[in-house]
């Protein structure tokens, strides 16, 4: 059953979307601002993330201690996250506090103070966390592979930045990012719960009407340099019997015309790209621009090269057109089922609606989702496989003991050792 969605907008372009749940006694608000880490300034990776987190460290008439007191007194929960394409502020609480919630959202996004002492303290804590984190975990391997294929493109850097890039971020950088990208007309506010559209629109005019609008910044980045052959990076580690690998390549955009075929193809890979005794996870990251397609692998060190080779062979078979029809139908069914499950959860329903807006998927997206998935043909999958699967030009990062795996990895291509 599709959700009943009610809409309105403010003069500044802010879209208001309501999922009414009368009698629930609670409201969940989700504000999505249509810009994220993709727009970090050069050499200042992590700027979008720092900017968003600093909203909670002081705004007009609300110091950090005041925010803590407010949430405790009213029973509100506040969460802010930064992605590559968006910044998301979520505030939930009793329906009786709806005006307080919208007032808080307005204060946070319209007039943050970016206090210098708070910024210095926050940057210091982030840098300490990065330096104390294990350099050999799954994320390090994943990031090494992604950086290898994207190079200087924004997607090649860590979303949260590095110690060096965080050190370079200044208060004027935050002010610039906020002024340039925190715009009402590239944002949507979804409210699910015990509130009506008229009630929300009236309060939003008062609390969020002053939020400025501006020109949307296009994502006109130079594409990454093509990868001509496999790149193998070995991160030497000696304290474990398990090996970790990430196989990365440039995937597809969420706005791609062949998105449905690409999504079915990814689901098909999740079923077929497996190896005995190994953990294999396939991660697609469709974004405004083509995001990374990553296969994460964990296995005993003495088998890591063989497992990676087996996975690449399977990717090659699918790229070559060896696509089992029965597995295709199962992959389609899983995608349709996953969407149905998302729509049974109010928070996930809000997320789906925001994806529709952010990626301009069309108001008929949910109505036609199952039909479009099921319409994907074997020929469509073969075209998508040719477009998106490149087993001979992937980046492979492996964390394992050099003397145990280097020779076996050489069968896959030239190996560069990262000390």
Regions found by a protein language model. Give the residues of each.
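An aromatic/glycine/proline-enriched structural segment found at the starts
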Residues: 151, 155, 159, 188-253, ...
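Mature N-terminal segment immediately following signal peptide/propeptide cleavage
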Residues: 1-32
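C-terminal regions of mature proteins
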Residues: 188-193, 296-297, 329-419
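Buried hydrophobic packing residues in well-ordered domains
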Residues: 13, 31, 49-51, 71, ...
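M16/MPP (pitrilysin/insulinase) zinc-metallopeptidase core fold and M16-derived inactive scaffolds
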Residues: 28-95, 135, 157-158, 269-279
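Scaffold signal of the M16-like zinc-metallopeptidase fold and its non-catalytic homologs
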Residues: 101, 133-183, 204-207, 238, ...
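A structural supersecondary motif
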Residues: 37, 246-250, 269-299, 418
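M16/insulysin-pitrilysin zinc metalloprotease superfamily fold
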Residues: 57-61, 92-123, 285-342, 417-418
